[in-house]
Amino acid sequence: MIKDDVVTGRVVRVSGPIVYAEGLSACSVYDVVDVGEASLIGEIIRLDESKAVVQVYEDDTGMRVGEKVTSLRRPLSVRLGPGLIGTIYDGIQRPLERLFQEDGAFLRPGARSQPLDGSVRWDFRPHCNERGEALCAGIPIAPGSVLGTVQETPSVVHTIMVPPDIRGSVLSSFKGAGAYTIDEEIGRTDLGEPLFLSQYWPVRRARPFSKKLAVCEPLVTGQRAIDVFFPLSKGGTAAIPGGFGTGKTMTQHAVAKWCDADIIVYIGCGERGNEMTDVLSEFPKLIDPRTGRSLMERTILIANTSNMPVSAREVSLYSGITLAEYYRDMGMHVAIMADSTSRWAEALRELSGRMEEMPAEEGFPAYLPTRLAEFYERAGRVETCVAREGSVSIIGAVSPLGGDFSEPVTQHTKRFIRCFWALDRELAHARHYPAIGWIDSYSEYAQEVSAWWSKYDPRAGALRAAALDLLRKEQRLQQIVRLVGPDALPGEDRLVLMVCEMIKGGFLQQNAFDPTDVFSCPEKQVQILRTIVDFHERAVVLLRAGISLSALSQLSCRELIVRMKTTYGNEDVHKMQKVYDTMCTEFDQLSVCAAARTQGGEKVE
């Protein structure tokens, strides 16, 4: 039944979070519906001649056949505007903190609360052109045009933009500077469309932009294993697969804390509630090194924990990426942490089974790759509709059962990402953090960001290649060592083992609880790696000149090199040159000694 643009039907079948309704044939796929007496939020995901299949995003326990279903004739959308930063939402953008104050610790079915606080008045400042003239009525506008700014947090200036789907090309009225709520009209177009500080956007539709740009700048995370060996660019995509207890969540937390993105969107999708609690308790205490302010002043949290309705997991990733695209359109660099896409895929599998669809690999639906592509392809570095530059970077955790990387979610994810941080169980059990294995991991962005790294050291790319080559060689040598022991190896091979221990202990391994080692600036990372690689190159020369490996292993500079990461902070990078000079001095002394002994036919022990 259609009445005042609202379509009403009735429930004819309930299968967990999937509800079948009749009388909704006039609706469209992905229309939002209110289901049952409690008005639960749902979404039409399939239509046929007589029935609509509705995915309910809330707990529908107790729902009966015959209850009313009302279509709102609009897609599921999120509200975008000032007030998003520092808020924790569920997958359908309900503010959990406000709902907790109203209903307690457990969500009441049908609970509603506005995603943005309509009582807050924001100090709005109109946009000024190049001549310093403020925006006023009669000025041409276009989708994405800047209307003005508000100070959302002390470290984030929120740009108020014309919605991408606005009708009209001229600003017919405009209020100008003042304090407004998100519900107050600040202007109107020539076709009568009102303009507000906020706007709505469908979560399943990517926000438009002018063009995609090539990636060229890394997302600096402060984690040496990531930044140097397996870098992620701004606008790139990465996956962190790993078995239980290998550190996926902790690695994502570290990246969220210390990366140089302007905005962080952290999506807890189907994981434990304690992990989101850790974020809420830790982030406000941490200081952003770039702004000196709390990290929560640049963070948006979306929590769909394992005990929340499974169907809401499916939409939480789309809600998060839509929020990220909104800030990208302001010209910001946004990083999304999705933890975990495996739980999201499991939600797809459960919903697919409820709808009696034909399963594919391991019970996952055949459209799993399509859904993964829809999510990851919304990342990128772009030029916005008004010639601003912004980016969305996606880091998705994958939780394969038993750590098996051949399972469908991991394999399909690898098709759509260019950076793969494979977590190694043996490293994790050895307390090596971050436990990113250097054999299985890779990054296709290394060449594209090499020019950026060369400003810190022209040899940066060569240093990375040399270190990775040593680690791969060490991996092969370890197989021989397990059989015959290290003493059976030639001197140069034993030197490789010794230097790789320096790389692993002095460069790759980081202490997340050490304030000096928790974050390394690019200069510090390059300086440590340069010192270790040059140590190996000079040691090889001396080894061939007759110096024994035991003499090289007794050099005092070895211990100094391994301790550089904790001895020198980011503000003391220039002091690290002392260690390099000490190393050169000790090698020079050995060279002189080797030359003298060589003339006498002796070997330096």
Curated annotation (Swiss-Prot):
One of its GO terms (biological process) is proton motive force-driven plasma membrane ATP synthesis. GO terms for molecular function: ATP binding; proton-transporting ATP synthase activity, rotational mechanism; proton-transporting ATPase activity, rotational mechanism. It holds the Pfam family ATP-synt_VA_C. InterPro entries: ATP-synt_VA_C, ATP-synth_a_Xtn, ATP_synth_asu-like_sf, ATPase_F1/V1/A1_a/bsu_N, ATPase_F1/V1/A1_a/bsu_N_sf, ATPase_F1/V1/A1_a/bsu_nucl-bd, ATPase_F1/V1_b/a_C, P-loop_NTPase. CDD domains: ATP-synt_V_A-type_alpha_C, ATP-synt_V_A-type_alpha_N, V_A-ATPase_A. It catalyses: ATP + H2O + 4 H(+)(in) = ADP + phosphate + 5 H(+)(out). It comes from the Bacteria. One of its GO terms (cellular component) is proton-transporting ATP synthase complex. Its EC number is 7.1.2.2. Gene3D superfamilies: 2.40.30.20, 2.40.50.100, Bovine Mitochondrial F1-atpase, Atp Synthase Beta Chain, Chain D, domain 3, P-loop containing nucleotide triphosphate hydrolases. ATP binds at residues 242-249. Keywords: ATP synthesis, ATP-binding, Hydrogen ion transport, Ion transport, Nucleotide-binding, Translocase, Transport. HAMAP family: ATP_synth_A_arch. Belongs to the ATPase alpha/beta chains family. NCBIfam families: PRK04192.1. Produces ATP from ADP in the presence of a proton gradient across the membrane. The V-type alpha chain is a catalytic subunit. This is V-type ATP synthase alpha chain 2. The lineage of its organism: Bacteria, Pseudomonadati, Spirochaetota, Spirochaetia, Spirochaetales. The gene is atpA2.
